[in-house]
Design a protein with these regions (language model features):
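Active-site beta-strand/loop signature of hydrolases that rely on acidic residues for catalysis
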Residues: 1-12, 47-49, 149
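Short, glycine/acidic-enriched loop or turn micro-motifs at the edges of active sites
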Residues: 9, 106, 152
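Extended active-site neighborhood of metal-dependent phosphoesterases/phosphodiesterases
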Residues: 12-140, 144, 158-191
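Histidine-centered catalytic micro-motifs
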Residues: 146-153
């Protein structure tokens, strides 16, 4: 089982002092408990919401989430990449299958995150790309499953692609039949 991020919506795992901590951690418990008592192995990668939706404090939030999963996952579920590092992390699933996990939020996070000064195995974008190329070349004859939160390429809104209807009639996103044409302003809405 691979959890592809946004494991705790809306802003990751808060400190235990936060008034809603118990409610928020219950969502994480449900994901962990799903695997207990089974033969399944689980992997959890962070998404932008686990990094406090890209805000300051995001690094601390994923460190709390990793510590929680490590403590209560009982070896059934692993949080990767570790320590807020970008990855890639390579896991052999079988003789012919390799799971490669990366933290895609690391690439776009504007606040504190591990970098050159960190203990991460790969500290820069170039090092991450080089290792990813090495993994792909080393496993060219296997099925490679690449697990990240954000898609590498998207033909949808996350990739910057919108339909003509979204550009001309942006209010139809809010109400199905609200066809008020806004040809210039409407193009700014999806952005």
């Amino acid at each position: 089982v691979v959890y592809l991020g946004d494991n705790l919506y809306d802003a990751g795992l808060p400190s235990e002092a936060y008034s809603r901590y118990s409610d928020i951690k219950a969502a994480l418990d449900s994901q962990i408990n799903l695997l207990k008592g089974t033969q399944a192995k689980g992997y959890m990668i962070p998404g932008n919401h686990d990094w406090e939706n890209g805000r300051a404090g995001g690094y601390e939030a994923i460190m709390r989430q990793q510590a929680y999963v490590d403590q209560f996952g009982e070896g059934k579920i692993e949080f990767y990449p570790k320590e807020g590092c970008p990855g890639p992390v390579e896991v052999e699933i079988g003789d012919d299958v390799v799971l490669v996990m990366m933290d895609s939020q690391w690439w776009i996070h504007q606040n504190d995150k591990p970098g050159i000064e960190s203990d991460c195995e790969y500290k820069t974008e170039d090092e991450v790309i080089s290792e990813l190329e090495d993994i792909l070349n080393r496993n060219y004859n296997k099925l490679i499953l690449l697990a990240t939160h954000h898609p590498f390429k998207s033909n949808g809104p996350h990739g910057g692609y919108f339909t003509w209807k979204q550009h001309i009639f942006p209010f139809t996103e809010m109400r199905e039949n609200l066809y008020i044409p806004l040809p210039i302003i409407g193009s700014a809405y999806p952005i």
